[in-house]
A protein has these predicted regions:
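Electropositive, glycine-dotted interaction segments
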Residues: 102-254
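Short acidic/polar mixed-charge low-complexity motifs
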Residues: 6, 97-101, 111, 125-127, ...
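Short beta-strand segments that buttress and anchor functional surface loops
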Residues: 90-95, 117, 280-282
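Switch/communication elements of ASCE P-loop NTPase nucleotide-binding domains
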Residues: 1-29, 35-49, 53-62, 281, ...
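A short mid-domain helix/strand-loop element embedded in enzyme catalytic domains
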Residues: 185-201, 272-290
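Generic recognition of flexible, low-complexity loop/linker segments
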Residues: 221-226, 265-268, 312-314
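Conserved P-loop NTP-binding catalytic core
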Residues: 25-38, 42, 51-112
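Mixed-charge, low-complexity intrinsically disordered segments
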Residues: 246-275
Length: 344
């Protein structure tokens, strides 16, 4: 996949090294997991592509664009005559609550060849199959493990919805049914796997506005954090403006990099759109005494907007006990500000 020709593993399993303190580790049963990890490496060494692989999985699981000939979006390793024609393969082991799962996916740009989901009932138990989906006779063939009871009618409907280029989870979202354990994973994907934060400031700022607009607690936290960062910012407030959806707005949304594809399609179906404008409060002392001014984000530095966006995403992720990937966390930020983020 992308620049990865051979298997590469990125693990959050903690070693026995206790020199950094147990506050950086969370324990589930007998498994010790790191709360966060930092990738170092030379330019063009694949750091961003690793994060892009995680973002690809998130989008693939949640994509709701249902067309017969849609592409999966997978790009193989193209610097080898063999691998450019081979499927890309992903494997993800993760916890949802106290339950450990293992998910695998094999696909190229046209179709999914195999998709599986297993879980471990206990730490000493062997893994148990929940789902096995393969491409056979030009269609998806889905098999469930003994733990999952599905009626023949529901299985047939699910099979029809599960087009060759779609994730099983996309098809599952279109069928009214209950899938114990599998639905726990689906809900985890929706609620706790966050959008990867890119280096570009505009998209980070846009995502932060969505978070700050709906949660006063986030705004209070960000105000306090920006004061600690010594930006001469003493407060943050959000004004929400409801606008009618015009062709001009739809064209802007369609072309904007700030909207994920799934969000774009949801917005296109709406008759109105909420626009969140953030204002930063600056308190200054001059010959007139103490005065307060409010400035929009356009008049803030890239570093201010980047710090605001990154910290909003981290705070929201911690509240949801979720997963968040940040590409080039240091982009537009002084090293001391990066330290401030990591020290929280």
């Amino acid at each position: 996949y992308l620049s990865f020709r051979d298997e590469a593993t990125f693990s959050f399993l903690a070693t026995d090294d206790r020199s950094f303190g147990e506050d950086q580790v969370v324990t589930i049963g007998n498994t010790r997991l790191l709360r966060f990890a930092i990738l170092y490496g030379a330019n063009a060494s694949g750091k961003s592509n690793l994060l892009q692989a995680l973002e690809f999985l998130r989008k693939f699981w949640l994509d709701d664009l249902i067309t017969p000939n849609r592409a999966t979006g997978a790009t193989p390793f193209l610097l080898d005559q063999e691998t450019m024609n081979e499927p890309s393969r992903f494997e993800l082991t993760f916890f949802v609550g106290e339950v450990c799962y293992r998910y695998t996916l094999s696909l190229d740009n046209k179709r999914v060849y195999e998709e599986t989901l297993h879980y471990y009932p206990g730490e000493e138990d062997n893994e148990v199959m929940l789902l096995h989906r393969i491409f056979q006779d030009n269609r998806s063939v889905i098999t469930f493990g003994d733990m999952v009871q599905v009626s023949p009618a529901a299985l047939e409907e699910l099979t029809i919805k599960c087009l060759p280029s779609l994730s099983f989870f996309t098809a599952r979202s279109m069928v009214n049914m209950s899938l114990p354990l599998i639905d726990d994973v689906y809900n985890w994907i929706q609620d706790q796997v966050g959008l990867t934060i890119p280096p570009e400031v505009d998209q980070v700022y846009f995502n932060a506005n969505l978070i700050a607009a709906k949660d006063p607690e986030v705004r209070d936290f960000l105000s306090a954090f920006m004061r600690r960062a010594d930006f001469n910012i003493t407060g943050i407030h959000v004004e929400t403006e409801t606008m009618e959806m015009t062709d001009e707005i739809r064209n802007y949304v369609r072309q904007s990099a700030n909207f994920p594809d799934r969000a774009k399609r949801a917005v296109m179906r709406q008759q109105t759109l909420d626009r969140h404008n953030v204002y930063f409060e600056h308190t200054v002392k001059n010959k007139y005494g103490t005065e307060i001014y409010e400035l929009p984000h356009e008049l803030q530095s890239n570093g201010t907007n980047r710090l605001y966006g990154v910290e909003a995403a981290i705070y929201d992720t911690e509240k949801r006990n979720g997963f968040l990937a940040i590409d080039e966390i240091e982009s537009s930020l002084h090293p001391e500000l990066v330290r401030l983020i990591l020290d929280q």
